[in-house]
Amino acid sequence: MNEQVKTATEQTRELTDEEVRERVIQLAFGGDRERFDMFVSALREALPADVTVVLRGSAVIGVRWEDGAPFDADGPGTSDIDLTLVGGDMLKLWSDDAFYIPKFHTAPLNDETPNHCPSLVPLRRALCRIAGRAVNLQATSSFLQYARDVLMDQPFFTLIEGTKDDADQPEPANGARS
């Protein structure tokens, strides 16, 4: 992790949920709260209630993880939105060859990989239209989501908190965006 990313990560952890939400609206939705609300509504309508939807990456911390460049550094609409679907039966929707960690963490669904999860392609296309930029979807287990936050120090913002059936699920680390 380079210095810009480290600093942005530390600063993000100090923000309130509302401040992170406002950052996301400014960066990813050009300040248009109505488009942000439509985006979240589209997710709520399309996904089961037990699925948590997490936003990661430069839309949350303001810089790219790889090189520390600012969000949309290459021009308006050039940065993507990275969503992770946690829980429910989301992992079962991905094809067997679309996993980074079999049965625990998928590769992203994007323009180049529509066969990873054909059933979510219409949702992804709708989200791209609403956001006016590329949207990547991944699925992960709740344990791996927890590990990414705690072990890898990757901030996230919870767009939708899924209903919980299992009281034994790990809680986010102190200071996690949730």
Predicted features and spans:
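Catalytic core of pol beta-like nucleotidyltransferases
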Residues: 2-79, 86-178
